[in-house]
Curated annotation (Swiss-Prot):
The record's account of how the chain is modified after translation: Glycosylated by host.
Entry protein name: Glyco-Gag protein
InterPro entries found in the cross-reference section: G_retro_matrix, G_retro_matrix_sf, Gag_p12, Gag_P30, Retrov_capsid_N, Retroviral_Gag-Pol_poly, Retrovr_matrix, Znf_CCHC
Compartments in which it is found: Host cell membrane
UniProt-annotated glycosylation sites, renumbered to this chain: N113, N480
Cleavable signal peptide: none
Pfam family name, one: Gag_p12
UniProt zinc finger (CCHC-type) residues: 590-607
Topological domain spans for side Cytoplasmic: 1-67
Key words, A-Z: Glycoprotein, Host cell membrane, Host membrane, Membrane, Metal-binding, Transmembrane, Transmembrane helix, Zinc, Zinc-finger
GO molecular function: nucleic acid binding; zinc ion binding
Gene Ontology CC: one annotated term: membrane
Organism: Friend murine leukemia virus (isolate PVC-211) (FrMLV)
Described function: Plays a role in viral particle release. Presumably acts by facilitating the fission of the virion bud at the cell surface. May prevent the antiviral activity of murine APOBEC3.
Length: 626
């Protein structure tokens, strides 16, 4: 070792380990070798601190090292948390409820298409806490099974205290997601099992049903046949039970007859076999909407009564979502009876509802008191054989019964009863919607600033129908309506209509046309703003010119007064000078100042009186006290 550079003069001493009890190895561990050799130094062994003591000393001595140490510790902590969360999230199972929460924007869009609004917190509460208590098989994590959704929907739409109106938007939205699933729902939707039919339907026994028909709470519904070319019609068994959608007994409507023995229907297709009925009338109705339309005698599948392929009427109940939308998108009967009457009239004419459907429609859209008033007015409208309103209870109960009648809609007599019942119901709605006469309400209808005359006239006529017993379309009331139209129009239109020539011979249509011309010639808001600005500028200019004119007139008057004053002063001074000169005329050197004669002076004037001079009058001075 003496040849090693830099070690000349060093003392090399070999000492055993036992002589240095304070020697430590790495991290304070004892050394592994038996001994060691000190190459450089005085032979003393220095004790080096462990890494923990080194870090603490660096932390206390170096200020710059503190942020570095904190950053390292924070990075290690974040990395550990990230790895832990990634591992746990990867193990979380996806459920229908969590799927809807992850795609909440799509759920809100679906609810908006159904004309309803949903909230995320209530969505989670109903799905995980409320609907599992209905005992229909709803899991706490949700499901897209149409059968379970339909059962929950029936519970929600139950009438009376057992219903849940606040949950209607949520179950309707959930049903819409299952019926028309978005791409992220399709993997979770239960596929429909294919309907297997034997080649010869009459000779083989029917297939077992897929599920038992649930106990529902609306009205009975007979599933309609699905008439497509590849598959024959599937009608419910003629001996099977009807599905009850309310807690009441089913109406005595006749079941559809069995298929013809020859296996041919009216349209020449293969005779239907006894297939498995749908699990719910709502599911069958929605399924019928999703599939292609049937090529038979009818084109609508939404009517309660429609003609099936076998020549018999099929019953389709109202959709609960339709009833919900009708109720929430229209004013109440007390608020606007005309609008709700028009809605019910269109439903009665197009949907051809049965007696039970009419009761369901009235119970949904009207309150209890409104419904009783409508039924009372409808029974008053029943006419006897002489064509006048009758008071016979039997005739009234036959035409407009309050209990479920035995009317078969598959017979002409039953359909005639239903048509007459709908007409009486419509008359009751119209009579019950008439309010007591209140002309003040009619006078309170005025034309808005931007309302067209035609729209204003419609509102005015509606007020006449609602608050008066008069018909505004009656020619005898045209004069009253015309006067109201003129007086209650906008001020500019009313003034010009009052100045029309031959006003008394003008019809209401002529007045409306003139009002439309005046309305269309109105200036736009931009033109009105420009006109107001221009008028303001002109008014300001006129005011400024008037102020200048008044100032000039004031200056001119002041100048005139000053001129008069100066002229007066100058003339007074001139008069004073002229008066002084007259009092003291210039005398010659030999002229008498007393008699103005020449030849002597005033003291020698013979004309001057002689005698003692009287005392001079003393001038009195005024003091401040005087």
């Amino acid at each position: 070792l003496g040849d090693v550079p830099g070690t000349s003069g060093a003392i090399f001493v070999a000492r055993p380990e036992s002589n240095y009890p304070d020697r430590f190895g790495l991290f304070g561990a004892p050394p592994l070798e038996e001994g060691y050799v000190i190459l450089v130094g005085d032979g003393r062994l220095k004790r080096f601190p462990p890494p923990s003591e080194f870090l603490l000393s660096v932390w206390s001595r170096s200020r710059a090292a503190r942020p570095v140490c904190c950053s390292i510790v924070l990075c290690c902590f974040c990395l550990t948390v990230f790895l832990y969360l990634s591992e746990n999230m990867g193990q979380t199972a996806t459920t229908p409820l969590s799927l809807t929460l992850d795609h909440w924007k799509d759920v809100e869009r679906t609810a908006h298409n159904q004309s309803v609004e949903v909230r995320k917190r209530r969505w989670v509460t109903f799905c995980s806490a409320e609907w599992p208590t209905f005992n229909v098989g709803w899991p706490r994590d949700g499901t897209f099974n149409p059968d379970i959704i339909t059962q929950v929907k029936i519970k929600v739409f139950s009438p009376g205290p057992h219903g849940h109106p606040d949950q209607v938007p949520y179950i309707v939205t959930w049903e819409a997601l299952a019926v028309d699933p978005p791409p992220w729902v399709k993997p979770f939707v239960h596929p429909k099992p294919p309907l297997l039919l034997p080649p010869s339907a009459p000779s083989l026994p029917p297939e077992p049903p897929l599920s038992t028909p649930p106990q529902s709470s609306l009205y009975p519904a007979l599933t309609s046949p699905l008439n497509t070319k590849p598959r024959p019609q599937v009608l419910p068994d003629s001996g099977g039970p009807l599905i009850d959608l309310l807690t009441e007994d089913p109406p005595p409507y006749r079941d559809p007859g069995p298929p013809s023995p020859d296996g041919k229907g009216d349209s020449g297709e293969v005779a239907p076999t006894e297939g498995a009925p749908d699990s719910s009338p709502m599911v069958s109705r929605l399924r019928g909407r999703r599939e292609p339309p049937v090529a038979d005698s009818t084109t609508s599948q939404a009517f309660p009564l429609r003609l099936g392929g076998n020549g018999q009427f099929q019953y389709w109940p109202f959709s609960s979502s339709d009833l919900y939308n009708w109720k929430n998108n229209n004013p109440s009967f007390s608020e606007d009876p005309g609008k709700l009457t028009a809605l019910i009239e269109s439903v009665l004419l197009t949907h051809q509802p049965t007696w039970d459907d009419c009761q369901q429609l009235l119970g949904t859209l009207l309150t209890g008191e409104e419904k009783q008033r409508v039924l009372l007015e409808a029974r008053k409208a029943v006419r006897g054989e002489d064509g006048r309103p009758t008071q016979l209870p039997n005739d009234i109960n036959d035409a407009f019964p309050l209990e479920r009648p035995d009317w078969d809609y598959n017979t002409q007599r039953g359909r005639n009863h239903l048509v007459h019942y709908r007409q009486l119901l419509l008359a009751g709605l119209q009579n019950a919607g008439r309010s007591p006469t209140n002309l003040a309400k009619v006078k309170g209808i005025t034309q808005g600033p931007n309302e067209s005359p035609s729209a204003f006239l419609e509102r005015l006529k509606e007020a006449y129908r609602r608050y008066t017993p008069y018909d505004p379309e009656d020619p005898g009331q045209e004069t009253n309506v015309s006067m109201s139209f003129i007086w209650q129009s906008a001020p500019d239109i009313g003034r010009k209509l009052e100045r029309l020539e031959d006003l008394k011979n003008k019809t209401l249509g002529d007045l409306v046309r003139e009002a439309e011309k005046i309305f269309n010639k109105r200036e736009t808001p931009e033109e009105r703003e420009e006109r107001v600005r221009r008028e303001t500028e002109e008014k300001e200019e006129r005011r400024r010119a008037e102020d200048e004119r008044r100032e000039k007139e004031r200056d001119r008057r002041r100048h005139r007064e000053m001129s008069k004053l100066l002229a007066t002063v100058v003339s007074g001074q001139r008069q004073d000078r002229q008066g002084g000169e007259r009092r003291r005329p210039q005398l010659d050197h030999d002229q008498c100042a007393y008699c103005k004669e020449k030849g002597h002076w005033a003291r020698d004037c013979p004309k001057k009186p002689r005698g003692p001079r009287g005392p001079r009058p003393q001038a009195s001075l005024l003091t401040l006290d005087d």
